[in-house]
Amino acid sequence: MALAVILAALAACSNALGTVLQRRAALTVPASTSLRLGLITDLLRTPVWLAGIVGVIMSAVLQALALAFGSLAVVQPVFILELPLALVIGGAVFHVHRSRRSWTAVACIAVGLALFLFSLAPSGGRTWVPGLWWVPTLVITGGVEAALVLAALRRPLGLTRAACLAAGAALGNALTAALMKSAMGILGTWGVRAFFLSWQTYAFAAIGALSLFLLSTAMQAGPLIASQPALTLTDAVTGVVLGVLIYEEQPRTGPWIILAVLGFGLLTYGVFALSHTRCLAECLHTDEEAADPMEHATA
């Protein structure tokens, strides 16, 4: 399990680098009030975005390895580290001063995540999910994701639109991870031929691409304080739920649940606090007017 956590943390680091570069690229192309495939064409002409995609691909490879060695309910929450890592990487790349308030938020995320994972400590589970289990999973997850996208399209550019699109992307990310874990289980059990013949392999690639498109759109739709918490927290919670329900991973219960809730509350506070800091917005190369005005007083 320790190896899975390390690989997941490396995947989060690679994804954070990709996010920093994608965010910068997304703000250099024309914004739109609708979902347009031309956005991808514009981004493909942007070298910075292509470099970000390399980071995302490396992240996917590391994530697949992490899922092969560990449970979905452990691996997916580790991606919460992507947010503080974006602060560290973006600060180094763009020479942004990180305030004391931002480092406090990072500490809350790290401690909260450690407490959450230690308290849950899921055990057991299976390496892949039989086909019939995927029918309700895909219908429910896809239905909620579609509802979020439709809700976003009915709203103007701003907080609600960005949050809905980011939450939809997060659901897609968690579902991609669940499908990826099954594909890796098939690879380990039946070999390369079965891996490339399984529908899960192509499903996780397609849903992952859709999630990437939704995330790029969410980045244009509104401020970071709306999109980042929705993306980060929805991904983690959905990953745990899918791990327990379809992979039959068994978290600890009893008093451990109280500690897990406390840990999740602490990391949630850290995510929202960090998302409100101006230095994170600058690290992701945005222009956030909604950042906490008190931050400069505590820098």
Residue ranges of each PLM-predicted region?
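Polytopic alpha-helical membrane proteins, predominantly small-molecule transporters/carriers
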Residues: 1-299
